[in-house]
Structure formats: C-alpha cells, structure tokens
Amino acid sequence: MLSIPVLRDGEERSSRDTHLLHGVDGVPVATVHEAPAMVTRLTVKRMRAAPRTAQDKRLAALADAGRLFAEATLGGQTPEEYCRVQSIVSGVPIGVARQTLGRMRDDCGLLGDVVARQSPVGAGRTARWVRRGSVFGVVAPSNHPATHGAWLQAVALGYRVAVRPGARDPVTPLRLVRALLQAGLEPGWISLLPGPHAAADALMDAADLSLVYGSEATVARLRGNDRVLVRGPGRSKILVDVPVDEAVLDHLIAEISADGGVRCTNTTAVFTSGDHRALAEALAGRLAALPGLPVTDARAVLPVRPRKEAEGLRAALHRAAQGAVDLTERYYEADGGPVTVVDEDAAALRPAVMCVDRSDHPGLGTELPFPCVWVAPWGRQEGIGPLDDSLALTLLTDDAALVDEALEAPGIRTVLHGRVPRWWRDPHLPHDGYLGQFLMEARGFAGS
C-alpha cells in the first residue's frame, strides 16, 4: 500500500494522524499522513523565512519539474503507475491522467511567458507589478489533475506555496511537489499538507493569500474575504443560434463529455433558438452510447464512483429535475441502468440529458461531476440574462451584438465565439480571470 506523506522543508514526514485512501472500488490504496492545524501554521511560518530565489532559477526549475512529472520515476512511482493510481482514487478515466502528463510538461515550460502576459502594459518605468504577499495557500480539488497547473503560476511569480490536497486525489500534487524538489526548487518554497477541514481553515488563516476550490456553500462562506480567491461551480453554457448539423453536434458532445465531464468548464446547459426538444433528443442518443467501463480501461470515457455515492448523485439530479425530462433514461433500461456497476462496488455515471421548456428553469444551474446537460429554449428578446453566471459561454451565432453583450457581462468569465476546439488547453487564456490579478498589484515607482 502507498504512503502519502506530509512534505515540509523538502522532507517527507509521517504523522500520528492518518487515514486510509480507498479506490472507487472500495479497496484501500494508500495511507495518508495528516498535518494538523498547528503543524500547518508552523509550516507557513517557516516558509516565510525561506531564502529568496531568482526568477530565472525558479522558471528553470518549473520547466524541469514539468518534464520530470511527465517522464521520471518519482518516489518509486513511474508515470504510468501514477496514472493508474490517480484514476483509481479519483474515479476519473485513466486517459485524463495520461493527457495531463504531457500537458503539465508543456505548460511548465511556458510559465515564464504565461505570467509575463498577465502584467499590465504600464508596468516597468513608473509602476511595479509586485506580490501582495509571500506565502500562497492552496486548498486543492480532486476533480481533474490538471487543475494543479494553476498554482504553479504562483511559484513563477515568486510565491512560496503550501498545498492542502483534495481528499480523493493527493497523488497528483505529491508527484508535482516531488518533481519540483528534484528539479532544484528551494525546499522551503513548497509544502504538501494533507489534513482535515480544520487544517484547511488554518492554512487559509496563516497564508497571506489563498486559492480555494469548493462548492456553492464554500463560495458563500468565503464571499467577501479579499485574501481568498474561491473557484466554485462553473455552470458553463452553450448557445446554439445556428442550424444544427453533425459538426455542431460533435462540438456539443465534446464540450459536455470530454475528460469524463468532470471539469468546471464542461458544458452543463445548452440553450437554442431552434427546436430544443429535437436538439435534446439528438444529444441524448449520442451521449447514452458512451460506455460505462472501469476507470483503468484505456477506452474509459466516463467517471466512476463508489456505487452508493453514484446513486446519491443520480438522486440529486432527480431532486433538481422539477418537471424536467431525462431523455437518456430509456436507453439504459436494458443496459445496466444510469448507474452501471463496472468493477467490484464501483459504478460508472452514465450521461443525462434533461429537457426543460423554459430558459429560467431552476435546474439549469445544476452542476454534477459527470456528463449532465440541461437543454432549454432561448429567444433573442431574452438577451444575455439566461446565459449569465457562466465560467465559459460558447456562442454559436452570427449575432455580433450578442457577442459584445456577453463580453460586457461581469458574470461571464470566458466568451468563446464559434466552435473553438479544446480551448481549455490554452495556457494563456484566463481561467476565471488571471491568477496574477489576485496575487499581484501595481505600485508606483519614481527615481532620480
């Protein structure tokens, strides 16, 4: 069985406080050592005293760490073994972890350019773009391994970073921290602090600034705290205001289901000026054909959870329905049901297509960790209103004025005009704004 250590000052440490990490099939995979709140606070204090490092040295270490993450054996774990374990504990198809290896390698090599583009054009002569603090805390998620690429930007900008890993995936940040240390990053600049909720709160309290991923309840609890950047549900949407052909359907299917539908940028609502029922039926037929397979199967495209948890997620969908019709259910009647047991007590979450008859149905704000999309009618007279509150909004339309309205709406964080394939892979594209906007500030400078 694996061991997930507390990692401080470049040393992997055990703890008296531990818990077992199980795979989605219920089999124990690792012992996770926990850093209690007091240790978390002490670690942050020690990190403040870590020696400064030059930016070019940090960027070189980051680039090398990306290569090591993708190619090296770290802590006795090969890249392929990492992918196998990551998929088993997170429930995300193994292909996602395999893609993340290459993505992390490529993105780490671009970090210098990525953070440079985030600085204001005026920074330089009469202004300086400087850090708001020195230690950055990260309360990480478990939905997708590539989310850890975000906090690497903080290292590039000169922050020491302490990561509290997500409960279902501590293996990705552990591999990344090991890669950073092997690449030569100063040991006091990076820590891995698995721990309970109290330790996460202690990290947010002790760090200068923090990035927290969480639910709507987490967003509400931390709203107004200018030291914490919260990334909650994405509620990403697509407007179809063009004739629907195979190319449009292909794009919709990819946006809904890519990476198992677990990303916050996966589409959860589709609005159309055309026949919404016909569009929903077409999506249901395509999505229902996606196979339920064990996550370690190379053909797997759907997430897997423990059976009871998967059933609970489907129950949550039914509670949100409020008259919406699930057009995929009939496809599953003779095919294992919408929650399909694939391995021991592990069950694949089959897609759902919910058809509603109005653009303000409350279910349209529902976001679940599998391919689940709500399809609704939309008319031009409704404007941006139903499309607002979106991490990403794709507009399949020739209406240039509507695109301008979307760009001006503060609740829409990314606007995509037309079928932009795999747009979420662009490391230069802001994700809910630039992280640098939160970590840095402009200060005036004048000298004789």
Identify the function of each model-found stretch.
Residues 113-254, 417, 428, 432, ...:
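Rossmann-like NAD(P) dinucleotide-binding subdomain of oxidoreductase/dehydrogenase enzymes
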Residues 22-34, 53-70, 254-258, 272-273, ...:
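Conserved C-terminal structural/oligomerization subdomain of aldehyde/semialdehyde dehydrogenase
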Residues 1-127, 289:
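N-terminal Rossmann-like NAD(P)+-binding subdomain of aldehyde/semialdehyde dehydrogenases
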